[in-house]
């Protein structure tokens, strides 16, 4: 038994001291980890800080699978995407660029990819490239994951105190949001690389443009949501613009909107500033209890705001029936917020608030599938659109919100 355990330990040690092919591992650089391993950083021993950065995504940009499968079968299943990459990199290096890899690898966090084996893969790729490279590996889904700029910020801290010139730098990646065309049978899986470059403020190119020297301007996007468009002074809070926030008589306001659309923030404002009583299923429980609470507040002479998603006729009818029965007017306030906008808001909250809950895309898609546009014929006295106008107390939060956060 002891002999078997010792043998297993020796095999594990041997695995760490050998490369992907079992050969003695040559130490070409060093590894470090941040935030409990959420970010892994490899720095070649001859890597130097430079003003100009030539940065690259990895999968689908520098390498592809040998097996021909979409995802690698193991950490040895790779080959360079273009034969010219080593010579292209040597020219970049001689032209004064620092070569950097930025890669999202959530499979490590999920336990689908072995962390130590992946480190060997990075070192093997760097060895194949033949020049000093620094690699940043985002393992989880936080601010290090592209298109967020956490990895770029860490690069700035590890550039030998040399200030980076973003205008002279470039990022190359295949997640460019390109659409399906006759020459491209499948659309890109995401916008992450293009948006990462935009957030950082560097030039962006696809692998076809950079390595393949393609001059074809492939169509992409446009993005489903651009946060910078929200900061127009022309946007009013309510539509129609003359809609009254507070009614002069007792009423029900029924909110409609995606999770993450800002409706709860709006409802809290009505509560704090205008003494509306908030009815919310997340805090009260069942819809039956919500209806009972609505009746109770109205009986006490209070106006009520229903802070639920209310996407369909059935969920809204419960409160319309109460309004009719008690002779109280009911208005519908619908958040003017798309699913992509809601995703952005949720991502922002998670990045800025450790206590914020992640809401899955599936939940948003369910809301979208159930959605029926509110109409006056349902029994509403007025339908008001509420435009999301973000406000910030922290300058860094505003800067983050204006970035692309969704892949």
Swiss-Prot record:
It comes from the Eukaryota. Residues 1-20 are annotated as: Disordered. Gene3D superfamilies: HAD superfamily/HAD-like, P-loop containing nucleotide triphosphate hydrolases. InterPro entries: HAD-like_sf, HAD-SF_hydro_IIIA, HAD_sf, P-loop_NTPase, PNK3P, Polynucleotide_phosphatase. GO terms for molecular function: double-stranded DNA binding. Disulfide bonds: none annotated. This is Uncharacterized protein F21D5.5.
């Amino acid at each position: 038994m002891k002999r078997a355990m010792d043998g297993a330990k020796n095999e594990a040690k041997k695995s760490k001291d050998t490369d992907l092919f079992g050969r003695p591992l040559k130490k070409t650089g060093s590894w470090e980890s941040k935030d409990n391993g959420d970010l892994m950083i490899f720095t070649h021993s001859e890597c130097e800080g430079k003003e100009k950065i030539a940065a690259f995504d990895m999968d689908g940009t520098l390498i592809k699978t040998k097996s021909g499968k979409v995802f690698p079968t193991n950490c040895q299943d790779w080959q360079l995407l273009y034969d010219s990459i080593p010579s292209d990199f040597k020219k970049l290096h001689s032209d004064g660029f620092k070569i950097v890899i930025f890669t999202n690898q959530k499979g490590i966090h999920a336990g689908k990819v072995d962390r130590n084996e992946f480190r060997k893969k990075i070192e093997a790729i760097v060895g194949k490239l033949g020049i000093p490279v620094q690699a940043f590996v985002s393992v989880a889904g936080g601010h290090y994951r592209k298109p967020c700029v956490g990895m770029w910020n860490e690069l700035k801290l590890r550039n030998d105190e040399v200030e980076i010139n973003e205008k002279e730098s470039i990022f190359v990646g295949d997640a460019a949001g390109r659409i399906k065309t006759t020459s491209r049978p499948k659309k890109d899986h995401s916008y992450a690389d293009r948006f990462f470059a935009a957030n950082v403020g560097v030039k962006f190119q696809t692998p076809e443009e950079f390595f393949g020297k393609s001059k074809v301007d492939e169509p992409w996007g446009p993005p489903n949501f651009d946060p910078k468009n929200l900061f127009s002074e022309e946007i009013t809070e309510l539509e129609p613009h003359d809609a009254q926030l507070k009614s002069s008589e007792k009423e029900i306001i029924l909110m409609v909107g995606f999770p993450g659309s800002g409706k709860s923030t709006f409802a809290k404002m009505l509560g704090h500033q205008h003494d509306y009583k908030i009815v919310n299923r997340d805090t009260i429980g069942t819809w039956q209890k919500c209806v009972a609470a609505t009746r109770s507040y109205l009986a006490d002479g209070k106006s009520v705001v229903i802070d639920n998603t209310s996407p369909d006729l059935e969920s809204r009818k419960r409160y319309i029936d109460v309004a009719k029965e008690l002779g109280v007017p009911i208005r519908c306030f619908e958040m003017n917020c798309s699913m992509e906008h809601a995703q952005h808001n949720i991502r922002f909250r998670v990045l800025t608030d450790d206590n914020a809950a992640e809401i899955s895309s599936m939940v948003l898609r369910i809301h979208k599938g159930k959605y029926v546009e509110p109409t006056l014929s349902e029994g509403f006295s007025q339908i008001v659109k509420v435009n999301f106008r973000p406000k910030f107390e922290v300058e860094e939060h505003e800067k983050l919100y204006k970035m692309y956060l969704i892949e």
